[in-house]
Curated annotation (Swiss-Prot):
One GO CC term on file: nuclear pore
An MF annotation (GO) of this entry: structural constituent of nuclear pore
Name of the protein described by the UniProt record: Nucleoporin NUP82
Gene: NUP82
Keyword RNA-binding: no
Organism the protein comes from: Chaetomium thermophilum (strain DSM 1495 / CBS 144.50 / IMI 039719) (Thermochaetoides thermophila)
Coiled coil, from the record: 676-762, 806-829
C-alpha cells in the first residue's frame, strides 16, 4: 500500500502556471445551455486527464489544456525568489491566464466540439487522442512535443477528424466507451460502444478520410444475443428513430466496456468485455479489426492450445457436439491464419517492422456473444435489482510461453518479470453505483466462439447450453452509505507500478485497491503439482487476507465530480496520481514502491505477521485546503441592477419609495439574488472558520511533537540535567572530542598489551616456506648422518630426487674406476713402448688432448662435489650447534 508523502505541490497550485491547466475558462458558458432548454446534465464517466510521458492533456469545458509537468515544475522551482508577496502580486499572477500570456510548458488546444468534453483517451502509440462528448467522438492528431513547447499566445489548432459524422450524433444513442484495440496496426484501431449496445470497429488512417466516416465492422448486440445461426444479419439499423418498445433496451443498456492489455495471454487481447447497467456481464471473442498485428507469442500459443483442444475433443467420447463444433471452428479460424503470409509494415516510430495479418473470414466475422455470466458464490444478501454497474476493469491472464520455449531457458529468463509473476486466470473487476467492487475470476476461460452454421442439423428439443460463469472471489464497499449519490459515476483507473493495483474514483474521494496479497499465492497453488490439501489451502486463502484497500483522498466539501485518477511514475516527477475538480487539481505523491522479485513458486503458507514498529511521524502530510468558490465568484447584484435600469421597472429607481406591487416585485427579485449569494458566502465563511479552528489544534499538535523532538535531542546531548550550570555548545563539542580521544588512546594501549600477551602465550604457525626448509634440512641430515639422526622429525616425502650422499658415493666409485683404468692403460702403454721401441704407431689411437680434457672434466666434477659436501657438513654443524 503506497504511503503518501505530500499532497498537491506548489507548482500545481495557484498562482503557479501549473494551476492554469485546471482553472475554469473565463468564457465558459456551457453551464447555462442545459438550463436554457430545461434539461439536466446526463451523468457519465469523467475521464478528462490523459497523459503522454510527462505531458498531460486536461479537458476543461470545450477546451483542452496541454502541459509538460516536468517543465512546469522546473520553471517554478527555478523562479527568482521574491522578498514580498502580497495580494497585488497574487492577483497579477492569477490574471495571466485571462490575459493569455504565454507560459513555458503550457498551451491551450482549440477543439471543434459543441459540448463539454467528457473523456480523453490516448492511443497506444500516443499519436492519436480520442475526444468524447456525451454523443460525439473526435480524433485529434497529436503533434510532436517540440511543436507544443513553442511559446505562443494564440491557442494551438491541431488537425481534428470527426468520427462517424452521421453515426455518433446527438440524435442517436450516447457513447459510453471508446477503447483503442490492443491489436490494431500502429494502435490506430478504435472500438466505440454506445448505450444501445452497438459495437463499432474503426480502423483509422490519416491518408484515407473514409476510415473516419464508416466503421469496418458494426455489430448490434441485441440482435446477436437473440441470434441462433451464423449467417444472420447482425448489422446496425440505419434508422435514427426507435421502432418500438423492446425489453432489451433495459437489459442491454451498456455501462462500460474494456479490453485487457496487449501483453495478456490466450484469447484475452481480442476479448471485449461489456458491463450492462442492469448488472449483467458479456464477452465478445474474438473481436478483431480487418488488419491486426499480434504479439510474437500470441499465434503460436493459440495454435498449440487449439490443436490440444481438438485432439482432446476427438479422443474423449463424452464430449458434447457443441464442444466438438467449437473446437472445429477454432481450428478452421487458426488454419486460415496459418495459411496467410503476413505483411511486414514499419512501426509508426520507424524503429522496427511488425507482421500484419488479415482478419479470418471463416467461420464468420461476427463472434458469438457470450453471456450473461452467472456469478458463482455471489453474496446471498445481494439483490439483482440493487446492482447498477458503472464500470468494468479486466486484468488479462499471464502469457503461457513456458511450453513454447522448452530448451530456451535463457531467453525465457530474459523476458519481463510481469509475464512470469502473474495469475493464469482473467480477473474481472466490476464497480456499481454504490461503490461496491466485485472481483471475479474467469475459471473456465473465455475462448473464441461462433454461432453454429445453418447447415448443421441441430437436435430437436436439445437442452440449452449452460451459461458461462464467473467465480466471485471478493466483494467489498469503497463508499459509506451517506456518500452514495444517484448521479455519481465511479470509475476504475489503472496503476502505473503494478498490473494488479488500481484506483476507484468517486465524487466522495479516491480509493486505492491492490490484489497482490492473494494473486501470487493463488497462482502458486494453481501451478502446484501436489493435490493433497489443496481444497483446504484455497479455502484458507479465500477466507484469509483479501485485497488491500485504502481511502487515500476524501472530498470534504459538497461532492463535485472528480476526474478519473491518472497514475504517473516518472524519475523526474516521482510516483503520484493526478485528479481534478471543476476548478482545482488534486495530486497525491507517494513513496516510490520497491519492486520485489517474486519467485516463480512461492509458498502458500501464511507467514506470521510481525508487527514492525514504525518510526514516530513528526510530520504528517495534509491535503491542501481550497476555499469555496463563492468567495471568488463575482456578485450577480451589479448585473441585476443593470438589468433593472434597462427594464420596465427602471422608473422606480429614481422615484420615491412607495408601497406597491411593483416595488414588492423588485424587492422580491433582489432578495432572491442577494439571499442566494449570502447563503453561499455564509457556508464558505463557516467552512473557513472551522478550518481555522482545526488549524489551531493541528498547530498545537505540531508544537507538542516539536517539544518531544527537542527533549530527545537534549537527552542525547546531555542538556536535560537541570542541576548542572548551563554549558555552551562549543564546550560540549570540545568535551565530547576530548572524551573520544581519551577513549581511543585507552583502547589503543589495551590493544597493544593484548597483542604482546598473545604473542608470548601462543605459538605462531609456521609459513609454507619455513615448513619446506625444515623438511629439506631433515632430509639432508638423514642422508648424511644416517637414519638415527632424523628420528622424531617430520616424515619425509617419498618421491625425492637422488640424495647428495649417494651421488657423492657414486662419483667417488666412478673416479676410482677411471683412475684405475687410466693407470692400467698408462702401464700397458709403457710396456708396449719398451717392448717395441721401433714402433711408430701406438696401440690405442686416443689423442692426448682428449685424454687431458676428459681428465680435467672429471677433476672439476670431483671438486664441485667435494665443495658441496663440505658446505653441507658445515651447515649441519652450525644447525646442531645453534
Amino acid at each position: 500500500m503506497p504511503k503518501i508523502k505530500s499532497f498537491a505541490p506548489a507548482w500545481l497550485n495557484e498562482p503557479a502556471p501549473g494551476h492554469k491547466l485546471f482553472a475554469p475558462a473565463a468564457d465558459d458558458g456551457t453551464a447555462t445551455v442545459p438550463l436554457a432548454y430545461g434539461k439536466k446534465i446526463k451523468p457519465g464517466p469523467r475521464r478528462t486527464i490523459a497523459r503522454r510521458g510527462t505531458e498531460i492533456f486536461v479537458a476543461c469545458g470545450k477546451q483542452i489544456r496541454w502541459g509538460d509537468l516536468a517543465q512546469l515544475k522546473e520553471s517554478w522551482e527555478s523562479r527568482p525568489s521574491r522578498s514580498s508577496v502580497g495580494p497585488t502580486s497574487t492577483k497579477k499572477d492569477s490574471s495571466d491566464f485571462d490575459d493569455g500570456a504565454a507560459t513555458a510548458g503550457y498551451r491551450i488546444i482549440k477543439t471543434p466540439v459543441a459540448d463539454d468534453i467528457r473523456q480523453l483517451v490516448m492511443s497506444p502509440n500516443q499519436d492519436f487522442l480520442a475526444v468524447l462528448t456525451s454523443h460525439t467522438v473526435h480524433i485529434c492528431i497529436l503533434p510532436d512535443s517540440s511543436h507544443l513547447h513553442i511559446q505562443d499566445t494564440t491557442p494551438f489548432k491541431p488537425k481534428f477528424w470527426t468520427l462517424g459524422p452521421t453515426t455518433h450524433v446527438t440524435s442517436r444513442s450516447a457513447v459510453v466507451s471508446a477503447v483503442w484495440h490492443p491489436l490494431g496496426v500502429n494502435g490506430h484501431a478504435l472500438v466505440t460502444v454506445t448505450e444501445d449496445a452497438i459495437v463499432r470497429v474503426w480502423e483509422l488512417s490519416t491518408a484515407d478520410r473514409w476510415t473516419f466516416d464508416a466503421p469496418t465492422l458494426a455489430i448490434d448486440l441485441k440482435k446477436l444475443a437473440d441470434a441462433t445461426y451464423l449467417d444472420q444479419d447482425f448489422g446496425v439499423s440505419t434508422s435514427a428513430t426507435n421502432k418500438g418498445f423492446s425489453p432489451d433496451a433495459f437489459d442491454m443498456e451498456v455501462a462500460a466496456a474494456c479490453f485487457p492489455t496487449r501483453d495478456s495471454g490466450g484469447w484475452a487481447p481480442m476479448t471485449l468485455w461489456l458491463a450492462m447497467t442492469s448488472g449483467d456481464v458479456y464477452a465478445l471473442c474474438p473481436l478483431l479489426p480487418q488488419r491486426w498485428t499480434p504479439p510474437p507469442t500470441l499465434i503460436p500459443s493459440l495454435s498449440a492450445s487449439i490443436v490440444a483442444k481438438v485432439a482432446a475433443a476427438e479422443d474423449n467420447p463424452e464430449s458434447t457436439p457443441e464442444e466438438r463444433l467449437v473446437a472445429q471452428q477454432q481450428l478452421e479460424w487458426m488454419s486460415e491464419i496459418d495459411n496467410q503470409e503476413p505483411k511486414l509494415v514499419e512501426e509508426a516510430t520507424g524503429e522496427a517492422t511488425i507482421e500484419v495479418y488479415t482478419r479470418p473470414s471463416r467461420p464468420g466475422l461476427v463472434p458469438k456473444l457470450q453471456g450473461p455470466f452467472d456469478f458463482d458464490l455471489n453474496p446471498e444478501d445481494e439483490q439483482d435489482d440493487e446492482v447498477e454497474l458503472k464500470d468494468i476493469y479486466v486484468i488479462g491472464e499471464k502469457p503461457r510461453v513456458a511450453d513454447l520455449m522448452r530448451g530456451e531457458e535463457e531467453e525465457l529468463e530474459m523476458m519481463k518479470e510481469d509475464q512470469h509473476n502473474g495469475l493464469s486466470l482473467n480477473i474481472i473487476c466490476l464497480l456499481s453505483t454504490s461503490g461496491q467492487v466485485k472481483i471475479c475470476l474467469d475459471i473456465d476461460g473465455v475462448e473464441a466462439q461462433w454461432l453454429p452454421p445453418r447447415s448443421k442439423n441441430k437436435r430437436l428439443f436439445a437442452p440449452p447450453p449452460e451459461p458461462p460463469s464467473l467465480l466471485t472471489f471478493q466483494t467489498f464497499d469503497t463508499l459509506k452509505p451517506a456518500e452514495v449519490t444517484p448521479d455519481g459515476w465511479p470509475m476504475f483507473s489503472e496503476d502505473a507500478t503494478s498490473p494488479y493495483s488500481f484506483y476507484v474514483t468517486h465524487p466522495a474521494g479516491i480509493t486505492y485497491i491492490s490484489l497482490t496479497p492473494w494473486v501470487f499465492r493463488l497462482e502458486s497453488e494453481l501451478q502446484s503439482d501436489s493435490e493433497a490439501g489443496t481444497e483446504f489451502r484455497i479455502d484458507l486463502l479465500a477466507k484469509g487476507q483479501g485485497s488491500e484497500r485504502d481511502r487515500i483522498f476524501t472530498q470534504t466539501r459538497t461532492q463535485s465530480p472528480l476526474a478519473a485518477a491518472t497514475s504517473i511514475d516518472d524519475p523526474d516527477l516521482g510516483y503520484f496520481i493526478l485528479s481534478a475538480t471543476q476548478t482545482d487539481p488534486i495530486a497525491l505523491f507517494f513513496e516510490t514502491p520497491e519492486r520485489p522479485v517474486v519467485p516463480k513458486e512461492t509458498s502458500v503458507v501464511i507467514p506470521e505477521h510481525v508487527e514492525e514498529r514504525p518510526p514516530s511521524p513528526y510530520w504528517e502530510p495534509r491535503p491542501l485546503f481550497h476555499p469555496a468558490e463563492a468567495l471568488d465568484k463575482p456578485s450577480a447584484v451589479p448585473a441585476w441592477i443593470d438589468n433593472l435600469r434597462t427594464g420596465r421597472r427602471r422608473p422606480l429607481l429614481t422615484q420615491e419609495l412607495r408601497l406597491s406591487m411593483a416595488t414588492l416585485e423588485v424587492f422580491h427579485d433582489g432578495h432572491k439574488v442577494v439571499s442566494t449569494e449570502v447563503s453561499d458566502i455564509n457556508d464558505a465563511v463557516a467552512e473557513l472558520f472551522r478550518k481555522c479552528e482545526a488549524l489551531q489544534g493541528e498547530l498545537r499538535d505540531q508544537i507538542k511533537k516539536v517539544n518531544e523532538v527537542k527533549n530527545r535531542i537534549h537527552t542525547i546531548t546531555g542538556d536535560d540535567l537541570s542541576d548542572d550550570p548551563p554549558v555552551s555548545e562549543d564546550q560540549l563539542i570540545k568535551q565530547r572530542i576530548r572524551v573520544a580521544r581519551e577513549r581511543q588512546e585507552e583502547l589503543a594501549n589495551r590493544m597493544e598489551r593484548l597483542r604482546k600477551k598473545f604473542g608470548r602465550t601462543t605459538t605462531r604457525e609456521l609459513s609454507d616456506k619455513e615448513k619446506a626448509w625444515i623438511e629439506e634440512v631433515q632430509n639432508m641430515a638423514t642422508s648424511i648422518l644416517g637414519p638415527e639422526a632424523g628420528q622424531g622429525a617430520l616424515a619425509t616425502t617419498p618421491n625425492l630426487a637422488k640424495q647428495p650422499w649417494k651421488r657423492l658415493e657414486e662419483i667417488k666409485t666412478l673416479r676410482n674406476a677411471l683412475m684405475a683404468e687410466a693407470e692400467q692403460l698408462q702401464k700397458v702403454g709403457d710396456d708396449t713402448e719398451e717392448s717395441t721401441p721401433a714402433s711408430q704407431m701406438p696401440s690405442l689411437k686416443i689423442p692426448s688432448e682428449i685424454r687431458k680434457a676428459k681428465m680435467a672434466q672429471v677433476m672439476s666434477l670431483l671438486e664441485r662435489e667435494s665443495a658441496l659436501v663440505d658446505a653441507v657438513k658445515a651447515r649441519i654443524e652450525r644447525l646442531s650447534i645453534g
